[in-house]
Amino acid sequence: VYERNRPYDTFGWGVVFSDATLGNFQVADPESYEEITRNFHHWDDCDVFFKGRKITSGGHGYCGIGRQRLLNILQARAAALGVKQVFEAEIADDADPRLAGADLIVAADGVNSQVRKKYAGHFQPDIDVRKCRYLWLGTNKLYDAFTFDFRKTEHGWFQAHIYKFDDSTTTFIVECPESVWLAHGLDKADQEQSIAFCEQV
């Protein structure tokens, strides 16, 4: 595994898996599954706050886990299986000599994948870029359910995607259409100003 980042780098806060996804983990690698389930926060309810009402829907089955904890679990499992892991190693091209002799190359280099661009004629990707803006935050306020909170402002709607991922932390993603983001002047706001605006909304 060649990873462009350092071993314990992470971006964002927590990630979410459905019960169905966890079931796939259990089939593919029971050891990783057991470690993940020892470290996650599970819930069945989804709370939606819209126009002053709270609507709760149950039986969904999701779990949240910290991104860094998940990376640590997967790195430890790979090491236990004898997988060579090279960190701070950028692979810019599948013709990189470090990949010579590989039976399979999996390039997980994000939405702007250079490998996908290189082989676009073969893969025929269908990429649909949208214009929503979001801010991925974390808070120590704990929520009992996966929460969607919609708030209307003078220029349009904001929504928050909220989920607890450990005993003390919740992911709090704030999203809005780009037109609303621009109308509120958030394109000129720094991080602190953006967070203060979200707190006020």
Specify the residue positions occupied by each region the protein language model found.
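Glycine-rich FAD pyrophosphate-binding loop
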Residues: V1-G12
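Conserved FAD/dinucleotide-binding core of flavoprotein oxidoreductases
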Residues: I55-H60, G66, L81, D144-V201
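Extended, Lys/Arg-enriched charged tracts that mediate electrostatic binding to polyanionic substrates
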Residues: G138-Y143
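Adenylate-forming
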Residues: L135-L137, F172-I173
